[in-house]
Swiss-Prot record:
Binding-site positions, Zn(2+) 2: 139, 142, 152, 159
Name of this protein: Palmitoyltransferase ZDHHC15A
Entry remark concerning the domains of this protein: The DHHC domain is required for palmitoyltransferase activity.
Organism this protein belongs to: Danio rerio (Zebrafish)
Membrane topology: Multi-pass membrane protein
TM stretches of this protein: 15-35, 49-69, 167-187, 207-227
Localization per record: Golgi apparatus membrane; Postsynaptic density
Gene transcribed to yield this protein: zdhhc15a
Entry GO terms, CC: Golgi membrane; postsynaptic density
Active site: 153 (s-palmitoyl cysteine intermediate)
Length: 328
């Protein structure tokens, strides 16, 4: 028992290596840009001040969003979704999955749960002993169920979900701006270095490598940010993109899509002044989400005939019409 526990601790430490790699690369880029580029290569004091101000603004917002994405723990389901001792005993006594289904169904009747497994059963986590809320998944790395789980990010050593997805989006945005700023401001100097007008080999190496690394990261981050913007405006998670969520009557690829604006507000909130800052402002509690009455493009309607359909909620703003929501 002692050895596996020790191995688990060592594995947790190894998970921090990618985070340290990111920190080291960013700190080196800070050194290369501020010292080698701004202080050594730039001759114009005005240009130096402007570049340093813009750089530190991007660096500050990047660092803030990075820290929030790394340090904010993923939200787990509340106590009401967890099995009581008696429920667990009753559930474990049944060895057949068919016999267990009525137990899960009875307990889930009191909960706002609409998603199902591909076979139509109630989604249950055997590790955490709880009924999974809609869009909740168990992370094998974090060893817990995560509300509205998007993915486990290797470079942040954290699960991206309901509590920190906004921070992840801002992290991508400010990372891209950080790289683009470096590329756009350093490129003219790189051209001079290429033409041989600057001869310091150490400075040349740092600046050339800085531009190359920043350009590569900028291209990668651009595609990643575009992908997550599409997910955000479609109200999908990465896991839902990979595997369509199922409901009582079948799959629902657009079940949570309540319109681009409302989808955006679910993550970033209604307070516009907080949109660009890594401060939590998402709507809801992460356990239940508005459902669209729009038909699934690859399956039957996302609604259950034994339950109510047409529950009205105001999703975007009081000035807009209420969105009709089908409760499965």
């Amino acid at each position: 028992m002692l050895l596996p526990a020790c191995l688990r601790r060592c594995a947790r430490l190894l998970f921090w290596i990618p985070v340290l790699v990111v920190i080291v690369v960013v700190m080196w880029s800070y050194y290369a840009y501020v010292v080698h580029f701004c202080w050594i290569l730039l001759s114009s004091a005005t240009q130096r001040v402007v570049f340093l101000c813009l750089f530190h603004l991007c660096f500050g917002m990047f660092s803030w969003s990075f820290w929030k994405a790394v340090s904010t723990p993923p939200s787990s389901p509340s106590v009401e979704f967890q099995f009581s001792t008696s429920d667990s005993l009753l559930y474990e006594l049944e060895r057949d999955d068919v016999a267990k289904s009525p137990i899960l169904l009875e307990i889930s009747q009191k909960l706002p749960v609409h998603t199902r497994t591909a076979t139509g059963a109630i989604r249950f986590c055997h590790h955490c002993q709880l009924i999974k809320p809609d869009r909740c998944h168990h992370c094998s790395v974090c060893q817990t169920c995560v509300l509205k789980m998007d993915h486990h990010c290797l470079w942040l050593n954290n699960c991206m979900g309901f509590s920190n997805y906004k921070f992840f989006m801002l992290f991508l945005l400010y990372s891209l701006l950080y790289c683009l700023l470096i590329v756009s401001t350093v490129t003219p100097t790189v051209i001079q270095l290429w033409r041989g007008r600057l001869f310091d080999s150490c400075v040349k190496l740092h600046v050339l490598f800085l531009t190359l690394v920043s350009a590569i990261f900028a291209i990668t981050l651009c595609f990643l940010l575009i992908f997550h913007i599409w997910l955000l405006t479609s109200n999908k998670t990465t896991l839902e993109w990979l595997s369509v969520p199922f409901f009582a009557n079948g799959p629902g690829s657009k079940a949570f899509d309540v319109g681009v604006q409302a989808n955006f507000l679910q993550v970033f909130g209604k307070k516009k002044r907080l949109w660009l800052f890594p401060v939590f402002s998402s709507e809801g509690d992460g356990h239940s989400f508005p459902l669209s009455c729009q038909m699934s493009s690859h399956g039957p309607p996302v609604m259950n005939g034994h339950e109510r359909c047409a529950t009205l909620r105001t999703v975007a703003s009081p000035k807009e019409a209420a969105v009709t929501i089908a409760v499965d």
